[in-house]
């Protein structure tokens, strides 16, 4: 009897392995298409601007305005998720944003472009912070580094697979088959799978471990005990959820750190194909394969760093060092544009660092925020970070139109990431879980 009352580490590991295999692969695929739908305009740009006679500034604003809708709807969407349940809300979000993303193939004016990107951002707003909250209700703090790395490796994998796939679509459909240009086919072929995944989410996800029919009673007990221990270690508050969200200085500081990380991430995601093209590569498929290299190495690096953080129970330097790598990589890329091999190496280092900063960041606020602040707080942090998605591409586009080069913008973004790493070191002093 005593053995069943106190499960050993092997038993716990077996339970969490089962939960991981049940949840993470499907959520990974959903996030892969989420990210692909968000950033595939970077490849569409290679043909879209000439077809529609858009300027670089129009593209930058259209790419970035997505995040205005994202920011405005982030907190209410995450609160709705807690009210209606993850299964229903995640399914609804995916069906809506997949439909809107597909409709980008009908764009013919800047107004169409801005409007669809704005509403797509609003539809996607609750997905990522909702999944972070959802996973935190299944996995305790000391297991989240690896889990977040597995989940968020969908970002580099979306680049790894999506870049060559997008390049192939642009080339294969360049003749205008079916009356559609290559960039229109890309939005169609990459948007429809998201709608299908949204329908599947309704049937495959469980709202929580208590309602998961696929778990045995003793497995639920393991999860419940670990969640209770996690809750006991969180800060306590007497304030309402909304009061704590907007009056908690830590939330605003974490939001600023996340903004700095995302400044580098979105600069890379939206401009990597164009930067590689400017290095002298003209074929879209070649650009796609070269764009995949940084994402491949970033995926491996992300998983290794996530594993290291959990094994060492160390968060501080596992967050700050990748952020510094992102800044250094951008500086290398911008200073060696005459040497494509070194420039691509710099972009690879920047991608590895910036993308790895994402999963290393999220275990920190989920461990330090009280239960009352978690849903709204995580959404606010995410919304602040996503403002970088609006500012980064717009600034790069504006600088490119004004100076004919992206160099000045990349210097600025490198400085922002470096400043964020300093703030991260300050905010995480004493955190060892």
Which residue ranges define each predicted feature?
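C-terminal transmembrane helical hairpin of 12-TM major facilitator-type secondary transporters
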Residues: 315-364
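Extracytoplasmic gate region of multi-pass secondary transporters
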Residues: 41-42, 243-302, 358, 362, ...
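Helix-breaking motifs and short loop linkers at transmembrane-helix boundaries and internal kinks
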Residues: 53, 85, 106-112, 123, ...
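Helix-to-loop junctions at the C-terminal end of transmembrane segments
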Residues: 73-85, 301-314
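Cytoplasmic membrane-interface "Motif A"-like loop-to-helix N-cap segments
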Residues: 82-94, 310-323
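Cytoplasmic helix-loop-helix junction between adjacent transmembrane helices
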Residues: 116-153
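Glycine-rich segments within core transmembrane alpha-helices of 12-TM secondary carriers
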Residues: 146-171, 193-194, 382-392
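Conserved MFS/SLC helix-loop-helix module at the cytosolic interface between two early adjacent transmembrane helices
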Residues: 72-111
């Amino acid at each position: 009897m005593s053995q069943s009352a106190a499960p050993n580490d092997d038993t716990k590991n077996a339970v969490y392995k089962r939960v991981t295999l049940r949840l993470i692969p499907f959520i990974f695929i959903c996030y892969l298409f989420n990210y692909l739908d968000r950033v595939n305009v970077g490849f569409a740009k290679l043909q879209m601007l000439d077809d529609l006679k858009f300027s670089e500034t129009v593209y930058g604003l259209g790419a970035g305005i997505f995040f205005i809708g994202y920011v405005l709807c982030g907190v209410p969407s995450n609160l709705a998720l807690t009210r209606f349940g993850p299964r229903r809300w995640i399914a609804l979000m995916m069906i809506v944003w997949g439909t809107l993303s597909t409709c980008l193939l009908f764009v013919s004016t800047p107004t169409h472009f801005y409007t669809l990107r704005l509403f797509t951002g609003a539809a996607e707003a609750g997905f990522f912070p909702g999944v972070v909250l959802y996973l935190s209700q299944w996995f305790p703090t000391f297991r989240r580094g690896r889990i977040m790395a597995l989940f968020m490796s969908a970002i580099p994998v979306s680049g790894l697979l999506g870049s060559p796939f997008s390049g192939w679509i642009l080339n294969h459909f360049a003749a205008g088959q079916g009356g559609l240009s290559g960039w229109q086919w890309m939005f169609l072929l990459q948007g429809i799978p998201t709608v299908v995944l949204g329908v599947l989410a309704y049937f495959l996800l469980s709202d929580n471990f208590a309602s998961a029919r696929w778990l045995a009673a003793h497995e639920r007990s393991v999860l419940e005990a670990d969640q209770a221990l996690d809750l006991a270690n969180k800060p306590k508050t007497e304030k309402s959820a909304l009061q704590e969200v907007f009056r908690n200085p830590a939330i605003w500081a974490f939001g600023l750190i996340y903004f700095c990380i995302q400044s580098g991430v979105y600069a890379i995601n939206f401009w990597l194909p164009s930067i590689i093209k400017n290095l002298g590569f003209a074929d879209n498929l070649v650009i796609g394969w070269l764009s995949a290299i940084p994402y491949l190495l970033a995926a491996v690096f992300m998983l290794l760093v996530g594993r290291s953080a959990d094994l060492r129970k160390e968060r501080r330097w596992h967050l700050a060092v990748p952020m510094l790598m992102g800044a250094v990589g951008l500086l290398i890329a911008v200073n060696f544009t005459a040497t494509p091999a070194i420039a691509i190496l710099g972009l690879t280092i920047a991608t590895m660092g910036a993308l790895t900063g994402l999963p290393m960041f999220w275990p920190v606020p989920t461990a330090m925020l009280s239960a009352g602040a978690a849903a709204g707080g995580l959404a606010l942090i995410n919304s602040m970070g996503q403002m970088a998605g609006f500012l980064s591409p717009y600034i790069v586009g504006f600088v490119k139109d004004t100076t004919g080069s992206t160099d000045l913008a990349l210097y600025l973004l490198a400085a922002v990431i470096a400043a964020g790493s300093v703030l991260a070191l300050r905010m995480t002093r004493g955190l060892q879980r």
